[in-house]
Amino acid sequence: MSGVRIPLFPRFIPHGTVKLESAALKKLNSLELSGGYAVAVSGGVDSITLLNLVAALHKTQATSRPVVLTGNHGFRAEADHETRFVQKRAVALGLDCEILRWNRHRTSSKSQETAREIRYSLLHQWCTEHSVKFLLTAHNKSDQAETVLMHLERGSGIDGLSGMHERSVFGDITIYRPLLGFTRQEILEYATQKQLSWVEDPSNQDPKYRRTFFRNLIAESKNPGVVVDRLCRTTSHMHRALACILHYVRSSLDYCLEFSPLGFITVKSQELRSVPEEIASRLLLLSLMAMGGKDHKPRYSAFWPILTKILQGQDFTPRTLHGCKVRKEPDGNFSIVRELARIETKIGVKTIAETIQWDRRFAIKIMCTHNASAAETTSCSAKHAPNPSEETQNLYITPLGNGSLPEHLVHVNRDVACSLPVLAHGDKVLAYPWQNHNIGVSPTISVEEVLVRRGVINLICHQLYR
């Protein structure tokens, strides 16, 4: 059973408590949190400490108002009590609090990893819906050490061993971890001296979880503090090495890859074979992630055979991986094309002249034709304004698909052409991109920007700050 822990009143306030509060408030004060931010609070001692520090900061700096978020994934009966406890504590400190509940399909897995995924999904959804760009979490130095050991057990490379960072990116949300420089013991001492109350989660003591196993392993060592310090020092070394590798990945980008205005990537095989294997591997990984619209890497077991064949110049039949189709071209290079079956079939158009991000590959604009008069353009815009008619509601962007190709696309690789966007109304295609239109005031579709190259560069940055 979980329960609220209320420490006895302390006889004195040690120097370490004052130091933690001063350093943490200085860290919080240095963060760029314009426009408001959210604070993830589970009710444990770490997050309650963060909540207390944020409330103290808000009293002196009321420019950015925080919102406390606490999640209930429904795995434990005590979760309702814990979320209400957090809400009551937040309100007592003068802060707004939202309880986030997982109301989607139930999962058979109730592991800590599944709970974490659900929690982050809830947090990201709320932040996105409320246009909140910054999220604070209470990860600490001890969490970092345990994470490194867990990744080491899984055989992680430099990415995994570089651990968590004080600033990272999750989708379009920036996550800050202001307590990452303090151990769990330092935070516990602070909370005790400050007479804070918190919730004890029994799963944190359950040895069936690997994190608990490694937590106990560190605690049973001769000098736990030294072990934590050295493991965290390892993450710093690995992060520097990762930054170095990603620097060379970025500098090799245009040498090894060619980005087509038709929204696919050509891997220049000879150039790829001339760079170190680690650089080549990451370039191919990033290409698959960007083209497939993914933020995570493909399975190693499926990815490695493709990389090996490319580096060795071997032939292979076209194959799909990570939402992409990879094929060898007659010139010996390889193309990475979006897999048609993985593209969302319909994206509705609400207004004329809006720019839409489509399939994370194209920025698309819907316009009236350039040869329409001003009066016609006004009429067209009004026709497709907000609160649209039934006709406008049926206007959407969709991939061209496996039907017949228009004349201006017959010279294009069929896989590429089929994955291109078209403007449709009902079951009829109204317009294709890269085509001259002369059809009065009918809306047209144009590609404002191809986003694939930018997507690869963003992924490089996110790997450094994840």
UniProtKB/Swiss-Prot annotation:
GO terms for cellular component: cytoplasm. Its EC number is 6.3.4.19. InterPro entries: Rossmann-like_a/b/a_fold, TilS/TtcA_N, tRNA_Ile_lys_synt, tRNA_Ile_lys_synt_N. ATP binds at S42, G43, G44, V45, D46, S47. It comes from the Bacteria. Keywords: ATP-binding, Cytoplasm, Ligase, Nucleotide-binding, tRNA processing. It is found in: Cytoplasm. One of its GO terms (molecular function) is tRNA(Ile)-lysidine synthase activity. One of its GO terms (biological process) is tRNA modification. It catalyses: cytidine(34) in tRNA(Ile2) + L-lysine + ATP = lysidine(34) in tRNA(Ile2) + AMP + diphosphate + H(+). Signal peptide: none annotated. It holds the Pfam family ATP_bind_3. It is an enzyme of class 6 (ligase). Belongs to the tRNA(Ile)-lysidine synthase family. Ligates lysine onto the cytidine present at position 34 of the AUA codon-specific tRNA(Ile) that contains the anticodon CAU, in an ATP-dependent manner. Cytidine is converted to lysidine, thus changing the amino acid specificity of the tRNA from methionine to isoleucine. The N-terminal region contains the highly conserved SGGXDS motif, predicted to be a P-loop motif involved in ATP binding. HAMAP family: tRNA_Ile_lys_synt. This is tRNA(Ile)-lysidine synthase. It comes from Anaplasma marginale (strain St. Maries).
